[in-house]
Structure formats: C-alpha cells, structure tokens
Amino acid sequence: MQRFITLAFNTLLLLSLNAATPETHYTVIVSLDGFRWDYPDMYKTPNLDRMAADGVKAVMLPSYPASTFPNHYTLATGLVPDHHGIINNTFWDVKNRRQYSMGDSATRNNPEYYFGEPIWITAQKQGIKTGNMYWVGSDIAIKKSHPTYYRPWNAKPFLTFEQRIDTVLTWLQKPEPERPRLIMLYFEEPDGSGHHNGPCSLPTGAVVQHMDSLVGVLRKK
C-alpha cells in the first residue's frame, strides 16, 4: 500500500493514506496526549520534524478546559465542551446528583453524557467502516452505535503502544471491503510523564522521544 502522509499537529497527527486505487482514501488520526507545541524545539523529534517538512504544521487552539476528555471529544464531534456535554475530566452532574469522572466506569460509559455526533458515526452513516483505538467516547454506545472496530478502554489486557500500532496496521491490512477508512488512535503519553515529572525534565524528554519513534514506526510500516 502506498502511503502519502500529511501532518497537522500540536497533540494531533492527521495521516492521510492513499491506497492503490486513487479513489479510495484512508485517514488515521493520532493523538499524543499532552504533547506540548514546543516539545519538538526542546527535544529531538526527527520523525515529527520530517512529517512537518513533508506535509503541514499548523497552530491548534484547544477547547477550554484544556483537559483530555473535553478536548478529545471536541475533536471527535466538532463541538465545544458546553455543547457536547463532557465539560471536564471530572464534573458534578446537578440533574442526577452525582459526579462524572473519567476514572469511574459507571459514569464514563453512560451515553447520556455524550451529546453531538462523533465523526466515526458520521462516517458510518456514509457507509465508511471505522476503527478506533482508545479514543474518548469510542467504546460508549453513543446513539446506540460503536465504531466498526474498537478496543474498550477497560478491556484486558490493556494494550501497549506497540500493540496498538500493530492492531491499527492489522485493520489496514484487511480485505478492502472490510478495511476501515477512518482510524483514530490515542496515546496517553507524554501527558502522564509531563504531569508527573514536569515538561522540562529528562524523564519527560525521554518519553517525548519515544513517542516520536513510534510515529516513525507507524509511518514506516
């Protein structure tokens, strides 16, 4: 499969994959959670630098609050948090007198909190198969629907970064009628390391460079 890849990134990579037939296009959206805009200036990121040089590098303004769940669901729906319902990683539900939390599966998996229409549902309405790896909302029955292929966040075993890439590549190797044309892939780093160690630290720098190497693996394969 020939791959023509362009990039627009802050914490987000957009990979456009063009298959052998020119009329069939594949898009892989990759999130490196917590990847600061200036990390490529602070640390060695040759793969991201190469993608920016080959394609496009653009400014992205996050939605507010700039937290994982509201921002990733904004990217999926095109709606700001107060319109799509996920207004923070944790918030108080006044109507039902309970707390929503990304760490509480009972509320996190409740579709009544998720408004709007994620892009994978829109794509499937157009007859496009989709694949989703750990993106916010993808394992929840929003509008009684799931992506064609997806991995629940609480499924065991929890996949390593390398296993996630292998799974995505397996999806892309399916026979064309079964192959997802829209794939969304989430990595929770370097967010965790940045919070724990601070952005200007050797451990965070090592994680940033590791995430860059994974982008290189995804491009190469």
What are these regions (language model features)?
Residues 1-23:
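Bacterial Sec-dependent N-terminal signal peptides
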Residues 20-23, 42, 66-68, 124-125, ...:
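Extracellular/periplasmic catalytic domains that process cell-envelope and extracellular macromolecules
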Residues 20-23, 50, 55, 105, ...:
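Coil residues (strongly favoring Ser/Thr
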Residues 24-29, 37-45, 64-69, 109-116, ...:
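Solvent-exposed, acidic/flexible segments
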Residues 24-36, 50-51, 75, 123, ...:
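Beta-strand elements within well-structured catalytic alpha/beta cores of enzymes
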Residues 40-84:
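Short, structured active-site-proximal loop/turn typified by the sulfatase FGly-forming signature C/S-X-P-X-R
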Residues 80-207:
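His/Asp/Glu-rich, glycine-adjacent segments
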Residues 171, 218-221:
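Generic, well-ordered alpha-helical scaffold segments in large soluble proteins
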